[in-house]
């Protein structure tokens, strides 16, 4: 079962993150960018089996040149449930709930070979305040306007 994240889920999600990503997560640019921020729980989701959270997808508010967007991450699934489509379900359900009238784009730091199935692309016109390999910055425009996104990605 998938539902919106609640504030009370935070400790369980952080424990799942620790179990899935391990101590190496602290060195990842995506972790460093998000570490002092609170997720936007309106769009963040959790996947339950029984009363246990076995998957989570989080979104954080961001903007590029005053255009509102969301940064996706992390997308995590308990190791014992990998390969069962839970990550794909979390991606599809969470993205379908995003209001494209107020959210213009979604960005993430990740692997194009996985996220391209959700129409994410590399965007070489945007960057973070810290060093992130350009081919890892993935972008999905939500509005069909002729907006071109370029510049610094600011998280808040």
Where are these regions (language model features)?
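Conserved active-site alpha-helix within GNAT-family acetyltransferase domains
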Residues: 100-104, 110-134
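Non-DNA-binding regulatory cores of transcription-related proteins
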Residues: 123-137, 144-149, 153-156
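Conserved acetyl-CoA-binding loop-helix of GNAT-fold acetyltransferases
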Residues: 77, 83-96, 108
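Short amphipathic alpha-helix that is part of the acyltransferase structural core
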Residues: 1-30, 46-53, 144-156
């Amino acid at each position: 079962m998938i539902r919106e994240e609640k504030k009370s889920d935070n400790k369980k999600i952080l424990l799942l993150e620790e179990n899935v990503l391990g101590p190496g997560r602290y060195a990842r640019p995506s972790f460093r960018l998000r570490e002092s921020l609170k997720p936007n729980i309106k769009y963040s989701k959790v996947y339950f089996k029984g009363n246990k959270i076995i998957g989570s997808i989080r979104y954080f508010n961001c903007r590029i040149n005053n255009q509102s967007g969301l940064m996706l991450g992390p997308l995590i699934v308990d190791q014992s449930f990998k390969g069962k489509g839970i990550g794909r379900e979390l991606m599809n359900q969470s993205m379908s709930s995003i209001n494209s009238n107020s959210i213009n784009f979604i960005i993430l730091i990740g692997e194009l070979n996985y996220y391209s199935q959700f129409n994410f692309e590399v965007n070489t016109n945007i960057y973070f305040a810290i060093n992130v390999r350009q081919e890892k910055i993935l972008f999905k425009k939500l509005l069909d306007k002729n907006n071109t996104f370029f510049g610094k990605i600011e998280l808040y």
